């Protein structure tokens, strides 16, 4: 005979409900009491309670969380999934949700960004985990973990026939997909890809993703810098020209511009994974990629996110 608590609800049944739902023990007690011990109805009760709690907590600030980065070689995706505390961000339940979310996004094989997050949340793929759709699972998790959970930034990029993605995850949390920072870098060739070129470029893209997150550039290429920014730098330098000759003045201006490019433009920044042979990103691409695969390579879409 099981030991009874309250009416006719056994401890064993409460434990079974907790294992099935992941809800707190007191919530499981209440659910079974409210449904006269009917296990299936208690599951539904907890789901509905979780949805109600999600609505209540929807205004709570979410400053913690994880960055998830993932690619299946056809699509690369990067997203920020937020919660209220660092404690919840490190729970298995939160990390499992985050991992399944980003994999589901990638498996859609579509371009996504933060403007169409709502359409992503209605996705019903991966029903083994999400059951109905992503947003319903999110709301259930809010009720379970007792914190607001939101999908923040989201970007998914579909590769072309000439491009390949590299991803990097910084400060990984229990998996290589979830961490405190992440980045995506796309490399594009002129003449297309084959197996050998893909392998070389994938390694190169992964290396550049590490560097991209580490340096956090404002621009990829020098020609992306707005002319008014360049004019402002020139004006600042001209204040100290004094009696310098035009040749000296030009030398000073070019030096100042080069310093700005080195600090802010990815192609001019230092490749950080080769300390023995200092080289810029542009030099790395030329020597380690273009000269090896005998094809032109340029940087395409890039993105980084941090918590």
Swiss-Prot record:
Any one biological process term the GO annotation gives: mitochondrial translational elongation
- CDD domains the UniProt entry points to: UBA_EF-Ts
**Keyword Flavoprotein in annotation:** no
User: Which UniProt keywords are given for this protein, alphabetically ordered?
Assistant: Elongation factor, Mitochondrion, Protein biosynthesis
GO terms of molecular function: translation elongation factor activity
SS bonds (residue pairs): none
Name of this protein: Elongation factor Ts, mitochondrial 1
Q: Which HAMAP family is this protein grouped with?
A: EF_Ts
Q: What does this protein do?
A: Associates with the EF-Tu.GDP complex and induces the exchange of GDP to GTP. It remains bound to the aminoacyl-tRNA.EF-Tu.GTP complex up to the GTP hydrolysis stage on the ribosome.
In which organism is this protein found? Answer: Paramecium tetraurelia
Q: Give yes or no: UniProt keyword Protein biosynthesis.
A: yes
Domain of life, per the record? Answer: Eukaryota
Question: Entry's InterPro entries?
Answer: EF-Ts_dimer_sf (IPR036402), Transl_elong_EFTs/EF1B (IPR001816), Transl_elong_EFTs/EF1B_dimer (IPR014039), Transl_elong_Ts_CS (IPR018101), UBA-like_sf (IPR009060)
Task: Give the family, as the similarity comment puts it.
Answer: Belongs to the EF-Ts family.
Q: What extra comment accompanies this record? A: This protein may be expected to contain an N-terminal transit peptide but none has been predicted.
Localization per Swiss-Prot or TrEMBL: Mitochondrion
> A GO CC term?
mitochondrion
Q: Which Pfam families match?
A: EF_TS
